[in-house]
C-alpha cells in the first residue's frame, strides 16, 4: 500500500534540496534561519506537551542548524563580526542544552530573540 506520508516527505526533502542547490549563500543562510525558527516553535510545543522524545529530536536538529550557520562563517574575512556571530551561535547552543535538560522555556525564548535579531539583520543585508 502506498504511504502518502512517505511521498510527502520525499517531496518536501526534494523541494528543500532543489532550493538549496539553486540558492546563493545569502539565501542558504536565510533558509537555515527560517528552519531554525520553525524548529524552535516545535520544541516549545514538545516541552509544553511533555513530548520529550520529540523535544530531543528537535533539539538535535537545532544543533545541526547552528553547526551549519557556524560553518558558513568566514572568520578570517569576517573579522570581529564573524567572531561575534560565532559566539552568539555557541551561546544559543548552550541555551538549547539548558532548555533540554531543564525543560525550561525561558532558554527557548532567549534563543528565539537572538536568532530573530540575527535573521532580521541578515535579511537587511540582502536588500543592500
Show the residue positions of the predicted features:
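N-terminal intrinsically disordered, cationic/polar leader segments
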Residues: 1-32, 37-42, 47-49, 53-63, ...
Amino acid at each position: 500500500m502506498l504511504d502518502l506520508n512517505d511521498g510527502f516527505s520525499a517531496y518536501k526533502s526534494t523541494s528543500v534540496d532543489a532550493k538549496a542547490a539553486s540558492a546563493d549563500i545569502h539565501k542558504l543562510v536565510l533558509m537555515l534561519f527560517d528552519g531554525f525558527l520553525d524548529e524552535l516553535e516545535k520544541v516549545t510545543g514538545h516541552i509544553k506537551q511533555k513530548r520529550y522524545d520529540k523535544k530531543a529530536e528537535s533539539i538535535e536538529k537545532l544543533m545541526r542548524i547552528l553547526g551549519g550557520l557556524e560553518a558558513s562563517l568566514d572568520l578570517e574575512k569576517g573579522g570581529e563580526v564573524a567572531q561575534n556571530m560565532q559566539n552568539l551561535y555557541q551561546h544559543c547552543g548552550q541555551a538549547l542544552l539548558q532548555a533540554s535538560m531543564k525543560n525550561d522555556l525561558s532558554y527557548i525564548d532567549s534563543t528565539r530573540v537572538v536568532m530573530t535579531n540575527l535573521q532580521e539583520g541578515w535579511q537587511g543585508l540582502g536588500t543592500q
